[in-house]
Amino acid sequence: MPVRQLPEQVINRIAAGEVVERPASVVKELVENAIDAGASRIDIFTDGGGRRKIAITDDGGGMTAADLALAVERHATSKLDDEDLLQIRTLGFRGEALPSIGSVARLSITTRHKSEPHAWGITVDCGDKSQIVPAALNQGTRVEVADLFHATPARLKFLKTDRTEAEAIREVVRRLAMARPDIAFTVAGEERAPVTWAAALPGAPGQLTRLGDILGTDFRSHAIAVRSERDHVAVEGFAAAPALTRANALGQYLFVNGRPVRDKLILGAVRAAYADYLPRDRHPVVALFVTLDPREVDANVHPAKTEVRFRNAGLVRALIIHALKEGLAREGRRTAANDGGATIAAFRPAFTPPRPSAGPMNWDWQRSPSAPIPRHDDVDSMPPAVSSAAFAEPMQAAFDVGGPRADLRLHEQPAAPDMLDRPLGAARTQIHDTYIVSQTRDGLVIVDQHAAHERIVYERLKTSLAAHGVQRQILLIPDIVELDEATVEALLARTDELAAFGLAVESFGPGAVAVRETPSLLGKINAAGLLRDLAEHMEEWGEALPLERRLMHVAATMACHGSVRAGRRLKPEEMNALLRVMEETPNSGQCNHGRPTYVELKLADVEKLFGRR
């Protein structure tokens, strides 16, 4: 077949295949045009998931008759001149949207510029343009799209259900509305109640108001303001505390110069910033806005303009991580999933009262036997409070190791008044040799002793690594650990990373390694269990994971093995010392795996459980 020039109509339909993927793509292009036109209000109406009808009305600048005639031609735009392609400042710039839509649907445009005595209208039906005629409309533009893809019926087969396509449209509008809280949006149609987002005040308060309207009150109550700036690149926005997470990354909204994007670089930076706070299967909720010189970012790398390319991607990534980490650290205890709401909701009545009966009750409280509650033998000799120095010691010899118990012991030790005013209060008891119950001035706190100490050890390992290196203890007799060949190879390939944390490992013949040094901070540890866990994690990492993240994984695994275990009995002074160190430790609200280290219940919550409120 000889080479030939394609007809203009076929060219437009090919272009439409890149620009108009589904009804949501049409809405995105048209709403972006309205935003670029300076609209303060945009109304969106759809029917049949956008297949039957899409109508978008704005109060922007509108177009003259001459501009309207050019607007439906390919590559005709008012947003770009010969020198602007490398410094794009508008959402749209290619001039492809309207002719592409008009080539696969019935397009109708009515518009009025303030300089015109009346509005003008034009229709485009599968590429066939009508004459421009006078029309009725106030200042602004109304664009209607009917029978989408009726010129290319094969494309209809790839669309989802009306409900799915309608939800995709709403998601597009949500993202655009987040970026412009100063514009009012209304989404109607699909036999659903209209959704309206009123224009908000400028600045961070207005931004948070709009985000709360879209993402819900949970996000607003958990939102943490973040900001970082360097070399004319600014990152700001709001990030949810780790108490609010999702099972996927769909709750991460990213914007570059006001443009909603899906960028793997930014998503990776968000994940890295939350790595110390969330379990691997949970994802944070954030809305981040990156602002930089348009010449430093290329927005012309994707047909749908949903991806960008940064000139200095490393700087953008570093600023995002710094902004999020600084915000999470600044909020301190608020970042923990420690509120008692979910805890209260999980409570159930301990028993169902028996129905009244004619016969006598066969259970007598006074005659019912009861076992005495076991206590520490030395409870009377315990001091009322101790400093956190006991927990600051590297070794954990102060802990009395014991087997798991399912008892509940009460330490009737009066707490110093000032301890009740501390954030985590005064320790009152330990239950199941795993949880510490403390009393505060207005409630109580339940602490997971292993999770709490794990975070403390982890933060100390990180601090030591950043400052002067982790102190080591040389073993008089090296621990010989037998492992399979693959595990040995994985460990020996990372000896430098392990050495950074004070773990000296070397080969000891086939299928074995010798551990000659361990971190002093961990005290006596189960070297075999630690090495097996490290090897398993290393197999997952691969070479793609940055060295910094690999080191943090090593630290987290070591902290888990070097922390006080569940099932270990603690003395009152040890429990109080742990609480005091928690109050001084960054990020102590979560363990290294993202689980909460404590839950706080206010007295009012407890009173609700018993019907006192």
From Swiss-Prot:
Protein's UniProt keywords contain RNA-binding: no
Name this polypeptide is given: DNA mismatch repair protein MutL
Source organism superkingdom: Bacteria
NCBIfam families found in the cross-reference section: mutl, PRK00095.2-4
Keyword Glycoprotein appears in the UniProt entry: no
A GO CC term assigned to this protein in UniProt: mismatch repair complex
Signal peptide (from-to): none
InterPro entries in the record: DNA_mismatch_repair_CS, DNA_mismatch_repair_MutL, DNA_mismatch_S5_2-like, HATPase_C_sf, MutL/Mlh/PMS, MutL/Mlh/Pms-like, MutL_C, MutL_C_dimsub
UniProt GO molecular function: ATP binding; ATP hydrolysis activity; ATP-dependent DNA damage sensor activity; mismatched DNA binding
Keywords annotated in UniProt: DNA damage, DNA repair
Family: Belongs to the DNA mismatch repair MutL/HexB family.
Organism the protein comes from: Bradyrhizobium sp. (strain ORS 278)
CDD domains in the record: HATPase_MutL-MLH-PMS-like, MutL_Trans
